[in-house]
UniProtKB/Swiss-Prot annotation:
Membrane-crossing segments per the record: 188-210
Bilayer disposition of the protein: Single-pass membrane protein
Name used for this protein in its record: Succinate dehydrogenase subunit 4, mitochondrial
Binding site for a ubiquinone: Y179
Cellular component GO terms, alphabetical: mitochondrial inner membrane; respiratory chain complex II (succinate dehydrogenase)
Transit peptide: 1-36
């Protein structure tokens, strides 16, 4: 503490002597006040090295001026924190606005866009077809024993025949998928096999006079 006071008094005396020598007269008071206000409060802190300049922001992988960060988004399921790249850009306007223009921050989050807008493509439609086929196969699987027990008319017996042929078709379809690898050949095999089963089911219904 004493060393700080001694250093400050020496600096003040030196400033006073310089002000008296350089600006005599009424202007000396003003110059003295300016010199006094420019003195550092802590001479030890003034002697310390200046802080290192701030490092620039990390650039994005695409080489654009973007800053990585996180932003909270509120949804029905709860609050989610999504990673974002915040790109900075100068606002457009008149020449007066461009001189003192501020940098705007625009948020970019591919993950949020994929959550908000589900993608629709060939894979989505194919998965929907697979789900429909699985549901139909499971339904006919449970319909066969049920109709065997409660079938009392031609309509229920026709449904029973259709369920049995559908199960036969799905069984052979799995076998053909394993052994027929060419797409076009597999497609036509399925078509003709389905036609064959439809004809057999029709002949069965007609033969037993179910309609």
């Amino acid at each position: 503490m004493a060393s700080r006071l001694l250093a400050r008094s020496k600096a003040l005396a030196l400033a006073l002597s310089r002000a008296d020598a350089a600006a005599p007269g009424p202007a000396a008071g003003v110059q003295w006040l300016r010199t006094l206000s420019s003195l550092p409060r802590d001479p030890a802190a003034a002697a310390s090295p200046a802080p290192a300049p701030r490092q620039p922001a990390v650039g994005s992988p695409l080489g654009l001026s973007k800053i990585p960060g996180y932003e909270q988004t509120s949804r029905l399921s709860g609050t989610q924190v999504l990673p974002r790249w915040f790109s900075t850009g100068t606002s457009n306007g008149s020449s007066a606005q461009q001189e003192g223009a501020t940098r705007k921050v625009m948020a970019f989050s591919p993950l949020e866009a994929s959550i908000a807008k589900p993608r629709k493509g060939p894979l989505t439609s194919e998965s929907w077809k697979v789900k429909q086929t699985e549901l139909l196969t499971r339904s006919t699987y449970y319909m066969i024993p049920t109709l065997l027990l409660v079938s009392k008319n031609s309509i229920s017996t026709s449904l029973l025949v259709a369920s049995v042929f559908h199960q036969v078709y799905m069984f052979y379809k799995e076998i053909l998928l394993d052994y027929v690898h060419h797409d076009i050949t597999r497609k036509w095999v399925f078509i003709y096999f389905k036609i064959l089963l439809i004809i057999m089911a029709k002949e069965t219904v007609v033969y037993f006079d179910l309609f």
